[in-house]
């Protein structure tokens, strides 16, 4: 690891790995909080390469890039790095499980994987001041999941934006709108954001489980959503709501229709959004279409459904109808991007050139989806269900 906390620019050059070595590897550099432009030159004089690049906690930055022996390709992207620090008297109240995440440490970490990762050089420099940052607020369906086989759309959407946009994912498993606020996570967002940045909020999964005086969709939940709106707009930011992803809960009679499990929470979010003129991405509707299109059995392919002993220390089958696997998260991220396009958000002009519009009624073939598992594995279900 290099210490470059007062970084202006640093560049690493590598000797190509041995021709027979295709193992994934990591590189980290100690930097201050902020956005960093990373430029990688992929390829090797010694071998053909197939390289996937991820950042921090499994954020997908580049899908597999193929290079012939002696061929080199250059790509740039923005990585957002943060720590729990807000002020000398205030920090984000992270959970014990988060303390091991790359998300909150003092380093910017890059992961190089794929069938044959090949890297010539990496350059890390502060991103231009005008870089637009999109801050994500939410729960386990949004968070940068640290371990396989779980994944969320927040760590996949990074793949679709070029070096003009940073994604800063502050979501965490098990959070409600209220606990997000109480743990100072919005305070951290506000401390990092500038005028014109975006804050995207998806809540509702865990909020419905709150059982105390004043809880409920139309009172406490709605009140907390209004807090997000007021604080973000006070700083000159743009706020967007995302209705919660559906759970895989089919009707018992025909196993063909998704049944509603979120009560009034999606409608409450829509009502607050309408009253306060907040744009809404209808992920609730798109994921319903997605699950119903895949069908009762194939929809399991998008979630953490795996037979016993698929992974080490997994004696029982995994049957999670809430949390996505990498394929499902990749598809949901495309739905969010389509929601941005439908809202005509200015940042969609920065989508990468290989973006193709997506229809959840015509999902990508899960049999064709390729994912190289990261080294961190934990089959323990994330907080929230």
List each language-model region with its residue ranges.
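Conserved SGNH/GDSL esterase-like catalytic core that processes O-acyl groups on lipids
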Residues: 104, 115-117, 127-135, 141-231, ...
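Compositionally biased, intrinsically disordered or flexible polar/acidic segments
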Residues: 1-148
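Solvent-exposed loop/turn segments at secondary-structure junctions
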Residues: 44-46, 140-144, 172-178, 205-209, ...
């Amino acid at each position: 690891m290099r210490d470059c906390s007062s970084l202006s620019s640093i560049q690493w050059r590598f000797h190509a790995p041995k021709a027979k070595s295709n193992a994934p590897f990591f590189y980290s550099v100690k930097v201050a909080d902020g956005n960093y432009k990373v430029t990688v030159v992929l390829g090797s004089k010694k071998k053909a390469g197939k390289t996937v690049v991820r950042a921090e906690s499994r954020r997908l930055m580049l899908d597999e890039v193929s290079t012939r022996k002696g061929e080199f390709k250059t790509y740039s992207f923005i990585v957002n790095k943060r720590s729990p620090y807000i002020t000398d008297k205030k920090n984000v109240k992270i959970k014990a499980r988060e303390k091991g995440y790359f998300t909150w440490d003092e380093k910017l970490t890059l992961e190089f994987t794929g069938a044959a990762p090949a890297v010539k050089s990496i350059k890390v420099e502060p991103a231009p001041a005008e870089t637009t940052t999109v801050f994500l607020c939410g729960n386990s369906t949004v968070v940068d999941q640290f371990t396989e086989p779980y994944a969320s759309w927040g760590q996949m959407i990074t793949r679709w934006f070029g070096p003009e946009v940073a994604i800063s994912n502050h979501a965490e498993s098990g959070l409600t709108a209220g606990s997000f606020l109480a743990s100072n996570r919005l305070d951290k967002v506000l401390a990092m954001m500038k005028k014109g940045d975006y804050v995207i909020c998806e809540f509702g999964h865990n909020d419905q489980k709150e059982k105390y005086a004043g809880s409920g969709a139309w009172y406490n939940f709605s009140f907390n959503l209004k807090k997000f709106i007021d604080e973000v707009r006070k700083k000159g930011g743009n706020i967007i709501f995302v209705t919660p992803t559906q759970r895989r809960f089919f009707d018992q009679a025909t196993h063909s229709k998704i049944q509603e499990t979120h009560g009034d929470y999606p409608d409450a979010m829509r009502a607050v959004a309408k009253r306060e003129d907040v744009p809404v991405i209808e992920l609730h509707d798109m994921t319903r279409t997605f699950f119903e299109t895949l069908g009762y059995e194939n929809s399991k392919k998008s979630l953490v459904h795996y037979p016993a002993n698929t992974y080490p220390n997994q004696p029982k089958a995994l049957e999670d109808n809430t949390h996505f696997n990498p394929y499902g998260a990749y598809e949901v991220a495309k739905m969010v991007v389509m929601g941005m396009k439908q809202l005509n958000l200015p940042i969609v002009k920065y989508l990468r050139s290989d973006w193709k519009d997506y229809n959840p009624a015509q999902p990508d073939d899960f049999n064709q989806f390729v994912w190289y598992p990261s080294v961190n594995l934990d089959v323990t279900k994330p907080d929230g269900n």
